[in-house]
Amino acid sequence: MSKTVRIPDMFLKASAASKRKSASNTENIPEKVPAGNENQEVKKMKLQAPEPTEILLKSLLTGESWSKLLEEEFKKGYISKIEKFLNSEVNKGKQVFPPPTQIFTTFNLLPFDEISVVIIGQDPYHDDNQAHGLSFSVQKGVKPPPSLKNIYKELESDIEGFKRPDHGNLLGWTRQGVFMLNATLTVRAHEANSHAKIGWQTFTDTVIRIISRQSEKPIVFLLWGGFAHKKEELIDTKKHVVIKTAHPSPLSARKWWGCKCFSKCNTELENSGRNPINWADL
């Protein structure tokens, strides 16, 4: 005779809860990217672990070439001070942009020997969901800030066939070799330049020097505005090309219009035997 076994309600409820949790976790897995749409490095970033509870900068720099080039830099005391400051911000309930895993986006996506152009910004955008580790760029779905709108306007007049995209994500430039570096890599939410004096510029000045000294091919540096112009002293101008213009901010837009820095950049790249940037590939 078969014997009926009754499973207690508490176990049935636990099993149902487990299934619901499993379904929820499945919904949170990032959607797969269609083949060919993004390179392997982008895919890795989309599938990376959740944001760390403690910020350790070296662990966030996953680009192999940059990890080697900056290995000694991460051993210096000022890096520990930056980490201490950032962790203090988080512990105080302050929001930091970009999220920790996106601080080094431009480093993690663009290997050192693939750099052909460097664009230097000042610090990340400080409003919600804007900054993601590329200077002047914002995430898709976020309205382009005024400076980026002016960049697009100049491109429309400078580059034949350029049509303003419906987003502000400049990842397409990074894929082509444009290293988009902010001098300061983090900012407190809604407070511009709030992290300008915590040590980041010591780090990014070192990065600029490394690019200048160790790049085997001429690099085009686009320096927009007085702040970026000061970085010229870090660059070997006998080896590399520096194009200085006004900043695309509305405050200096009159001098920005007509600068034609994008076509000039491509001319310099072609003169050195390198591929021009397809600025419309966004």
From Swiss-Prot:
Alphabetic keyword roster: DNA damage, DNA repair, Hydrolase, Mitochondrion, Nucleus
Region listing for Disordered, in residue ranges: 15-40
Annotated Gene Ontology cellular components are: mitochondrion; nucleus
Q: How is its activity regulated?
A: Inhibited by UGI, a B.subtilis bacteriophage PBS2 peptide inhibitor.
EC number in record: 3.2.2.27
Q: Which InterPro entries match?
A: UDG_fam1, Uracil-DNA_glycosylase-like, Uracil-DNA_glycosylase-like_sf
Catalytic residues identified in the record: 123
BP terms from Gene Ontology: base-excision repair; base-excision repair, AP site formation via deaminated base removal
Q: How does activity depend on temperature?
A: Optimum temperature is 26 degrees Celsius.
What happens when the protein's gene is inactivated? Severe loss of unracil exision activity. Increased number of germ-cell corpses in response DNA damage induced by ionizing radiation.
MF terms from GO for this chain are: uracil DNA N-glycosylase activity
Q: In this UniProt entry, which cysteines form S-S bonds?
A: none
**Reaction equation(s) it catalyzes:** Hydrolyzes single-stranded DNA or mismatched double-stranded DNA and polynucleotides, releasing free uracil
Q: Can you say where in the cell this protein is located?
A: Mitochondrion; Nucleus
Is Protease included in the keywords of this UniProt record? no
* Enzyme kind, highest EC tier: hydrolase
| Main location group | mitochondrion
The family assignment reads: Belongs to the uracil-DNA glycosylase (UDG) superfamily. UNG family.
Q: What function does the entry list?
A: Excises uracil residues from the DNA which can arise as a result of misincorporation of dUMP residues by DNA polymerase or due to deamination of cytosine.
Q: Record's HAMAP family?
A: UDG
Name assigned to this protein: Uracil-DNA glycosylase
Q: What species is this protein from?
A: Caenorhabditis elegans
